């Protein structure tokens, strides 16, 4: 089916920053996609094109990317008479049109918006739900897996104020019998956590960060973990909810060491750790708290640190800034035995096909996959369908708070309802591809 029209516009994300929205028209209607944006971004990510005009939106406008869609991509894809049901060919056309390795000519945010809209148009042409269309393209067979939600309930790092260097503290309801029950458990634990934090640290401790998690003024990861474990137990889910961390350690990697006091007014020299010391800290924390998954435990280019931790521990070790959903980086990480799970962010690489290629490579290597939102999000629910379509079994989309986060979780509730007996909840098998992980 031919593409009749492509039109992009600048809209706003959950942080009030500009982002790209694309409308793609075929005879089945208008198919819309909105591109997210990250705060802690890996240096190896595909180029997110911003205008750089400091007099408007602090330089974060995306009118150049919008212009590239409307003036370059749109006429080219209409003229090429692309088949929207051939995602691979459509994405290859877009990549060739850009012609650079990191999408610096047109912008990954321009290309991705069109790629996602084409995927939605393909699903409509095939008269399939988006998750089913992705599943058929990827080769996923039923029963279809509903993911364990990784709720980012407590924020630190670049997502919040306070001295806490670690960026995300997540709860994973692995013991729940269904996705809908996992949502209930997560919401109840989140509200319990917020109540405890406000009583202990004052009402401002209930204020939320970019991803909906609370952001109390804490000094150490132990303080954060103590709060979370107390909330889990008080909510009645002791032993049934696990903990995941996104350390985002590239953000506090300075001169070959990891500075846990990088945000502190009075930093202590003893809190500048080697990668061996930081590994020991993770192991020590896991003995006291039910931690099963650690994302970006080290800097994106500190390869030896990753290899060391993978050899010495049995965590799910998730590569985000390390791999940036890029098959070249991913292949290196696999060969070096750096991790055992990929964090999948479609805007890191900039097209649907390249994202699926990274998933396929991960599965073939025995890795798990956790699909992820970005801190600057929108109401777009593409990643909910992607998660089910590829059978990932894990999704992180922030806390059960803020509508741009709940949009993804609520869409999964609808998919669960639609699937009925064809759907299974990943639960304790979320890390099913990872033999060593402690799920």
From Swiss-Prot:
Disulfide bonds: none annotated. GO terms for cellular component: cytosol; nucleus; phosphopyruvate hydratase complex. It is found in: Cytoplasm. Keywords: Cytoplasm, Glycolysis, Lyase, Magnesium, Metal-binding, Phosphoprotein. It comes from the Eukaryota. Coiled coil: none annotated. Pathway: Carbohydrate degradation; glycolysis; pyruvate from D-glyceraldehyde 3-phosphate: step 4/5. GO terms for biological process: canonical glycolysis; glycolytic process. The modification Phosphotyrosine is found at residue 253. Mg(2+) is required for catalysis and for stabilizing the dimer. SMART domains: Enolase_C, Enolase_N. Mg(2+) binds at residues 246, 295, 320. Homodimer. This is Enolase 1-1. The lineage of its organism: Eukaryota, Fungi, Dikarya, Ascomycota, Taphrinomycotina. The gene is eno101.
């Amino acid at each position: 089916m031919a593409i009749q029209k492509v039109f992009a516009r600048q809209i706003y994300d959950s942080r009030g920053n500009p982002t790209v929205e694309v409308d793609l028209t075929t005879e089945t209607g208008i198919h819309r996609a909105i591109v997210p944006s990250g705060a802690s971004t890996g240096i190896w990510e595909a180029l997110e094109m911003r205008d750089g005009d400091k007099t408007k939106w602090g330089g974060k406008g995306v009118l150049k990317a919008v212009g590239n869609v409307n003036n370059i991509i749109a006429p080219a894809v209409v003229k090429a008479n692309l088949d929207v049901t051939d995602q691979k060919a459509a994405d290859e056309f877009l990549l060739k049109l850009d012609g650079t390795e990191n999408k610096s000519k047109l912008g990954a945010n321009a290309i991705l918006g069109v790629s996602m809209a084409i995927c939605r148009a393909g699903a409509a042409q095939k008269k399939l739900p988006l998750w089913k269309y992705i599943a058929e393209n990827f080769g996923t067979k039923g029963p279809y897996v509903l993911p364990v939600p990784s709720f980012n309930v407590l924020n630190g790092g670049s997502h919040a104020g306070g001295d806490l260097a670690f960026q995300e503290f997540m709860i994973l309801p692995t013991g729940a019998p269904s996705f809908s029950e996992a949502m209930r458990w997560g919401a109840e634990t989140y509200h319990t956590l917020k109540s405890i934090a406000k009583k202990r640290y004052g009402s401002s401790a209930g204020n939320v960060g970019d991803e909906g998690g609370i952001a109390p003024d804490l000094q150490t990861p132990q303080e954060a973990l103590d709060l979370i474990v107390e909330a889990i137990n008080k909510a009645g889910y002791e032993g049934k909810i696990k903990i995941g961390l996104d350390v985002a350690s590239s953000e506090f990697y300075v001169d070959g060491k990891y500075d846990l006091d990088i945000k502190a007014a009075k930093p202590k020299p003893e809190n500048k750790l080697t990668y061996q010391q930081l590994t020991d800290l993770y192991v020590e924390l896991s003995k006291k708290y039910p931690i099963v998954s650690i994302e970006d435990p080290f800097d994106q280019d500190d390869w030896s640190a990753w290899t060391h931790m993978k050899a010495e521990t049995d965590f799910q070790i998730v590569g985000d800034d390390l791999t940036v959903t890029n098959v070249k980086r991913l292949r290196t990480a696999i060969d070096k035995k750096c991790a055992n799970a990929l964090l999948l962010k479609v805007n890191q690489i900039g097209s649907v096909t390249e994202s699926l290629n990274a998933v396929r490579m991960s599965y073939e290597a025995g890795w798990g996959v956790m699909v992820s939102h970005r801190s600057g999000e929108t109401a777009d629910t593409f990643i909910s369908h992607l998660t089910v379509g590829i059978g990932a079994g894990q999704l992180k989309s922030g806390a059960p708070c803020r509508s741009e986060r709940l949009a993804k979780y609520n869409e999964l509730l609808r998919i669960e309802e639609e699937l009925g007996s064809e759907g299974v909840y990943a639960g304790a098998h979320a890390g099913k591809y990872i033999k060593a992980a402690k799920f």
